[in-house]
Each structure stands twice: as C-alpha cells, then as structure tokens.
Design a protein with these regions (language model features):
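Bimodal "functional hotspot" detector
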Residues: 1-212
C-alpha cells in the first residue's frame, strides 16, 4: 500500500464509518436493534471533501512565480490544485522545461497545506525526487527521473504523469516522455481519463519510444 501523505479529513471519515459499523454489529449481537433516529454527533465538518473555496485558494496563492497546476489525490482520484514555479527570466527554452518540471515535482512531493489536508487532499509522490532534461539522443521533450517510473507507486506515477502532461514541461499535449537517469529506456505516458479517475487501478497507458 503506497504511503499517501495528507488527506486527514478523508482518513477521519473512514475511521468514523468503520467505528460506526463495528458498533452496529456489536449492538446487533446483543439483541439491540440499531436506532434509525438521527443522532447529533456535533457540528458537520467545515470543509467539503475535495473542494477549496475561493477564499482558501486566495490565502494559498504565491505572489510570485509562474502559475501552474498539479494533481493531488483526493477521494481516490486525481484533482487539480494551484501552485507556482520560480523560473528566472531569460532561461533558455530547453533549460526552462527542466526547471519547470523540477518545480512541479517539488510541488507534488511537498505535504499539502493545512487547508488542503483538511479538505482531504494528499500526495503519494516521495520527497527527494529529481528530474533532468533529455540525454543525448533523446527526444527533445524527454524528462528523466532519478527514480525509474516503473519503480514508483501507481498513485505517485499517475500524479507525475498527469501533472507533467498538462504543463509546459512536456509540451502541454496530454502526454509526457519519461525515463530514468540510470537506464536508456523511455516511454511516452498518457494522462488518460481513467488515470485521473482511478489512479490506483494501474499504471498510466504508455508506449516505448526511442532514446539514447
């Protein structure tokens, strides 16, 4: 089971439901029928799962940098959130692509904010990942990770693929060419609808491409 950081609201909801089910089972075993009358367990949660208000988004906005979107996990699916990436003016295009990719990767591997955590957002992307541009002989839009894509958890790979594929780091065409810095193999991954809706069901669709 991959480690997903964040999503406190979702985790609490699962624990409450599990405890309620266990209690109902115990009552039934004692010959006591569970009540159908609504019970007051206190105020409802203040955050709607997987939704951030305009106020919440405003309080998180970084005043500088290139506005970008990354995909976090929420309720078992990929959901877009706003971030920003710092890119120095005048950065050469090939270098700019790698800088944006690293900024996106850093944003994905960072713990969600307190507001996002409360709303159920989480991430499976491990900290410490790095990304570089194409090696000699690679397609110009290739990106190479410090960890092989197929060695990442499915949730993490789905987050990375969909975030990169939807950004200037990969040409914003719905796919991204990924490999590792320790192997020659490259694959073009697609951010398919099923990848966004059920990232844990399998790796994103991919095809092998020529590399260095």
């Amino acid at each position: 089971v991959p480690e997903v950081r964040g999503g406190a609201a979702r985790a609490r909801g699962v624990r409450v439901l599990a405890a309620t089910g266990a209690l109902a089972g115990l009552l039934a075993g004692c010959g006591i029928r569970a009540t159908q009358v609504p019970t007051d367990f206190g105020p409802a949660p203040s955050m709607v799962p997987c939704e951030l208000s305009a106020t919440d988004i405003t309080t998180q906005t970084t005043p500088s940098g290139l506005p970008v979107e990354v995909f976090l996990l929420c309720s078992g699916a990929l959901v877009r959130v706003n971030r920003s990436v710092e890119v120095a003016e005048g950065t050469e295009e090939a270098r700019r692509r790698a800088v944006v990719a690293q900024g996106l990767l850093d944003a994905l591997s960072a713990d969600p904010s307190a507001i996002e955590d409360e709303a159920g957002y989480g991430t499976a992307v491990p900290p410490g990942l790095t990304v570089s541009g194409p090696a000699p002989g690679d397609p110009e839009d290739a990106l190479r990770l410090s960890t092989a894509p197929d060695a990442l958890a499915r949730f993490a790979l789905a987050q990375i693929v969909c975030t990169f594929a939807d950004s200037a780091a990969a040409g914003d065409n719905g796919s991204v060419v990924l490999g590792s810095t320790s192997a020659e193999t490259l694959r073009r991954y697609e951010c398919a609808p099923e990848t966004q809706s059920a990232p844990g069901d399998g790796n994103p669709p991919s095809t092998e491409v020529g590399g260095s």
